[in-house]
Structure formats: structure tokens, C-alpha cells
Swiss-Prot record:
This protein's name: 2-succinyl-5-enolpyruvyl-6-hydroxy-3-cyclohexene-1-carboxylate synthase
Family: Belongs to the TPP enzyme family. MenD subfamily.
Organism this protein belongs to: Shigella boydii serotype 4 (strain Sb227)
Gene for this chain: menD
Molecular function GO labels: 2-succinyl-5-enolpyruvyl-6-hydroxy-3-cyclohexene-1-carboxylic-acid synthase activity; magnesium ion binding; manganese ion binding; thiamine pyrophosphate binding
Pathway(s) annotated for this protein in UniProt: Quinol/quinone metabolism; 1,4-dihydroxy-2-naphthoate biosynthesis; 1,4-dihydroxy-2-naphthoate from chorismate: step 2/7; Quinol/quinone metabolism; menaquinone biosynthesis
Catalytic reaction(s) noted: isochorismate + 2-oxoglutarate + H(+) = 5-enolpyruvoyl-6-hydroxy-2-succinyl-cyclohex-3-ene-1-carboxylate + CO2
Coiled-coil boundaries: none
Pfam families noted in UniProt: TPP_enzyme_C, TPP_enzyme_M_2, TPP_enzyme_N
PANTHER family found in the cross-reference section: 2-SUCCINYL-5-ENOLPYRUVYL-6-HYDROXY-3-CYCLOHEXENE-1-CARBOXYLATE SYNTHASE, PROTEIN PHYLLO, CHLOROPLASTIC
Cofactor annotation remark: Binds 1 thiamine pyrophosphate per subunit.
EC number from the UniProt entry: 2.2.1.9
Subunit structure, as described in the record: Homodimer.
Cofactor(s) in the UniProt record: Mg(2+); Mn(2+); thiamine diphosphate
GO biological process, one term: menaquinone biosynthetic process
Length: 556
């Protein structure tokens, strides 16, 4: 009997089971203990294989692939701290709904807690963050193959969103020629091997039913808040709100076209919040709201009803409003709850939104961070997509720009960490094959710098804008102690990214004005490669411009 051969047959059943649930992309890190899984994945022609030497980046690469494909993405890593490096991506997926299947190789039980190398307690290490956790036994023919495949099917068949952790212990030897060991065990699955359906089929249903009193509420004064959603959903939501005559407050991730732009500016005006107080119902479609003023208004508003519609489970409302939590696909929910043509009831807010945008436009000529955020829609590639980082840059784009309706926008706004942003952007590009504009800050770029290796492999032009304001300038917007702000919060690194781009053989530009930036973009969109554009800006201008605009718009 060959242990290595049966390890591979066991792994082949696991990998084949994944294909029956739509898994096509599989991300693999180097490792010895994961050899059975890696070789089984390599031999399965259903998979598109991705590799990376850093497990944290690999997890985020998978996250980006899942964001675009809307299908589960598998990750294979070896045992030990390699597994722990998947934690950030798993947490993000749990909050934003992407499906990740984490296949973590492990030492067999007799090598745990006895001083064996690279052996840690892996079962349960992700606590409550996976939607499902499976701790498989070591491969043995005493356990029928139908148990193994149905165990995988149950976890994936009932997966609505988030991650599945499948811990896979393998005993040595891990290498060797294949023989007939376990062949009859494998063949007991019969014609399942020629089929394309799961062994065990389950169909989870979390769809909320139609709200029977919608005909009543749609005649009231309402407000639509649009959070994270797909591009197609964004266009439908914009039309739905327009038909109802309800003001639409669109987040940067809503892809609604933000018909009332600069919401995070005009929500600081008392006239706007006073008018919004007249709303009898608020319907929030999508979660992960970005703007500080939007979140403040959302927390303080007191309509008769507050509805939240999202296909992710959970409350999704830090303000704990009285109302309804409706778990549904947004587009499907809109069809069940059609709009009735009515005249707009808000008068003051459209005027304030226009004046806020004009105030932003009046400042657009200076070469700076806030101005780039406002101009970002001018630089979007045709038939492309946008990936926005976290901290100051996403807040500036949310407050100062107006993105086109239906233009795809991606981000990691679940836990809102700055780890893995470049890796996620790489996954977004690979899954879509579209030209991609990604924008992050300098600390975010440093945090995931080795992901530039992933950006060497793109199928369409990708431009990475690094806004270098020399530190975490988001803390300039917070009441951090002035005496310790630079040392303990901003942490300026005084670095530039030309040599990093050169190390990974990526094109690089460092424009000094808008004309040079436009020239760099024109060059970048011509070829299917990655271009790093470093925009070096004054460290405080972005935060100060936002604060000045907030003060100006609050007094309109």
C-alpha cells in the first residue's frame, strides 16, 4: 500500500467535488505538506491555476477573483503559519460575502503538540469567521469516498456567503509514483466521475418574501441609501429611486452614478438634514457605507421604518434602527417592489448637491490628492473597472467625485484594512480581463508591496496609482494628539516607488502636473501591462481641502 498514492486519491475527490460547486479559480502557495492537494489541482483540467509565494497575498488574490466571478474560489496552502496568513482575507470575505474555500494542509494528529516541525493546532483556528469549518481525518480507506464527497457537498451546497475552512491532514510519505492503492475506493463513486453535479445537492434559500405593504410605503416620503452593490444593480437602483421621486444618497461603491453628488459634503449642511427629517421611510440597498457624514446621518435619522436590503446575512446596521432586515438579491428585490411614478419631494437637497459640486470644481486646478479624487472619473478606462483602496483616498473619492452609473467599482470595505489591497486588485483584473485602474495610498502600497509580483501577470492594461502623501494622513482628520500625531499615527516613511516598480519590471511614472499625468495614462492604456503612477503630493493638502470644503458647504 502506498500512502502517497492514497493521499493523492483522497485529495482528488476533494478537488473534484469543488468543481461541482462552480469553483474554477484555484490559488496555490508553495509547500510540501500540501503536495497531495497541489498535484490533484494540477491534474484537474477544470481549474485555472494561480500561484503566489505569500499566503496573505494569495488569500487576497482569491478574494479579488471571487469579487468579480461571483463564484467560490479555492486556496491551497501548507501547514503552520501559512494557514494563519489567510485570516485577513477570510475575515473580509465574511463581511462582504465573497466565497472562499480554504484547503489547509496539516500534519497528522500524532505530530501535533509534540514538538514536530511546522505543526500547529489548525482545527478551529479561525474561530467563528468561516461560515463552515471541516476538520477532515487523515486519509484512510476505512472511510468511504461517499462520506468525503458528501461532507464537502454539504458545506458548499449550503454556503450563501463567506469562507469554508477545510483542514486536510496528510501523513508522509507525500511523494512517490502513483499505483493502484485506493483505486477501488475511488471507483465506488461510480459514474459521479463522469457527471458534473454534486453528489449531495442542497439548495439554500435565504430570500425574503415580498413586503405586502410596499404599495402603501411607496406613496410616502422616502430616502434611498445605496451602499455596495453590482454595476447592474446600481443602474437599476438609480432608476427606481428616480421613479419614486425619492432622493438617492449613493456611496462610492454603489455604482448608481450618484445623482446627488458630494453627499458627504452636503450632509454636513443643516438644511439638508432638516429636509431629510421629513422622510417617513428609509430604504438602504447594500451595506458598507463609506462617508462619515452619511454614517452620522444614518445613525441619527428616525423614520417610521428603516429597511435594509442585502443578500448578506446579519443586521448590517450599527445604529440598530427599528425596521426590517430583508435578505435578498437587490435586483430581484426591486422587481418584487416596483416603483410608482411620483414627483420628487426634496427641494433643498438637489440645490445643495449642485452647489457642493461647484465648490469642488472651483478647486480642481491645483495638483493634489483631493483634486485627483474629484478628477478620477476622467481617467477611467473604457469598458474597464475601478479598484479603490482604503483610508483617505476612498473618502475623498466618495465626497468629491461623481462616478458614472453602472461603472464597476471594487474595494475591500468590509473590515476596511489596508492589507492585501494590491493583491485583491490583481485578482479583480484576472477574473474580469478588463482594463483596470487601482488607486491606493503609500502605506497601503508598502503593506502589500510584494504583490507587485502578481501585477506582472495581467491580461489587459492595469494602472496602479500610488498617492504618496508620506504617511497615514487619514489621521489628520481625527482628533489625534498633535504632539504625537506624526510619530505614532502618520508614521511617514519618506520613500518613493520607482525602484520597487523596477524590481518587478513594471512601467513607472511620477508626474508633476495634470498634463504629465494624462500623458502617463495615455501611454499606460496602450499595452496589456502594469504601470505604476506615483503621485507625490503635499502631506496635508488632501485632508485640509476636505475640511475646507466641509466648512464651506455647511454654510451654503
Amino acid at each position: 500500500m502506498s500512502v502517497s498514492a492514497f493521499n493523492r486519491r483522497w485529495a482528488a475527490v476533494i478537488l473534484e467535488a469543488l468543481t461541482r460547486h462552480g469553483v474554477r479559480h484555484i490559488c496555490i502557495a508553495p509547500g510540501s505538506r500540501s503536495t497531495p492537494l497541489t498535484l490533484a489541482a494540477a491534474e484537474n483540467s477544470a481549474f485555472i491555476h494561480h500561484t503566489h509565494f505569500d499566503e496573505r497575498g494569495l488569500g487576497h488574490l482569491a478574494l479579488g477573483l471571487a469579487k468579480v466571478s461571483k463564484q467560490p474560489v479555492a486556496v491551497i496552502v501548507t501547514s503552520g503559519t501559512a494557514v494563519a496568513n489567510l485570516y485577513p482575507a477570510l475575515i473580509e470575505a465574511g463581511l462582504t460575502g465573497e466565497k472562499l474555500i480554504l484547503l489547509t494542509a496539516d500534519r497528522p494528529p500524532e505530530l501535533i503538540d509534540c514538538g514536530a516541525n511546522q505543526a500547529i493546532r489548525q482545527p478551529g483556528m479561525f474561530a467563528s469567521h468561516p461560515t463552515h469549518s471541516i476538520s477532515l481525518p487523515r486519509p484512510t480507506q476505512d472511510i468511504p469516498a461517499r462520506w468525503l464527497v458528501s461532507t464537502i457537498d454539504h458545506a458548499l451546497g449550503t454556503l450563501h456567503a463567506g469562507g469554508v475552512h477545510i483542514n486536510c491532514p496528510f501523513a508522509e510519505p507525500l511523494y512517490g509514483e502513483m499505483d493502484d492503492t485506493g483505486l477501488s475506493w475511488q471507483q465506488r463513486l461510480g459514474d459521479w466521475w463522469q457527471d458534473d453535479k454534486p453528489w449531495l445537492r442542497e439548495a439554500p434559500s435565504l430570500e425574503s418574501e415580498k413586503q405586502r405593504d410596499w404599495f402603501f410605503w411607496r406613496q410616502k416620503r422616502g430616502v434611498v441609501v445605496a451602499g455596495r452593490m453590482s454595476a447592474e444593480e446600481g443602474k437599476k437602483v438609480a432608476l427606481w429611486a428616480q421613479t419614486l421621486g425619492w432622493p438617492l444618497i449613493g456611496d462610492v461603491l454603489s455604482q448608481t452614478g450618484q445623482p446627488l453628488p458630494c453627499a458627504d459634503l452636503w450632509l454636513g449642511n443643516a438644511k439638508a438634514t432638516s429636509e431629510l427629517q421629513q422622510a417617513q421611510i428609509v430604504v438602504q440597498l447594500g451595506s458598507s457605507l463609506t462617508g462619515k457624514r452619511l454614517l452620522q446621518w444614518q445613525a441619527s435619522c428616525e423614520p417610521e421604518e428603516y429597511w435594509i436590503v442585502d443578500d448578506i446575512e446579519g443586521r448590517l446596521d450599527p445604529a440598530h434602527h427599528r425596521g426590517r432586515r430583508l435578505i435578498a438579491n437587490i435586483a430581484d428585490w426591486l422587481e418584487l417592489h416596483p416603483a410608482e411614478k411620483r414627483q420628487p419631494w426634496c427641494v433643498e437637497i438637489p440645490r445643495l448637491a449642485e452647489q457642493a459640486m461647484q465648490a469642488v470644481i472651483a478647486r480642481r486646478d491645483a495638483f493634489g490628492e483631493a483634486q485627483l479624487a474629484h478628477r478620477i472619473s476622467d481617467y477611467l478606462p473604457e469598458q474597464g473597472q475601478l479598484f479603490v483602496g482604503n483610508s483617505l483616498v476612498v473618502r475623498l473619492i466618495d465626497a468629491l467625485s461623481q462616478l458614472p452609473a453602472g461603472y464597476p467599482v471594487y474595494s475591500n470595505r468590509g473590515a476596511s484594512g489596508i492589507d492585501g489591497l494590491l493583491s485583491t486588485a490583481a485578482g479583480v483584473q484576472r477574473a474580469s480581463g478588463k482594463p483596470t485602474l487601482a488607486i491606493v495610498g503609500d502605506l497601503s502600497a508598502l503593506y502589500d508591496l510584494n504583490a507587485l509580483a502578481l501585477l506582472r501577470q495581467v491580461s489587459a492594461p492595469l494602472v496602479l496609482i500610488v498617492v504618496n502623501n508620506n504617511g497615514g494622513q487619514i489621521f489628520s482628520l481625527l482628533p489625534t494628539p498633535q504632539s504625537e500625531r506624526e510619530r505614532f499615527y502618520l508614521m511617514p516613511q519618506n520613500v518613493h516607488f520607482e525602484h520597487a516598480a523596477a524590481m518587478f519590471e513594471l512601467k513607472y511614472h511620477r508626474p508633476q502636473n495634470w498634463q504629465e499625468l494624462e500623458t502617463a495614462f495615455a501611454d499606460a492604456w496602450r499595452t496589456p501591462t502594469t504601470t505604476v503612477i506615483e503621485m507625490v503630493v503635499n502631506d496635508t493638502d488632501g485632508a485640509q481641502t476636505l475640511q475646507q470644503l466641509l466648512a464651506q458647504v455647511s454654510h451654503l
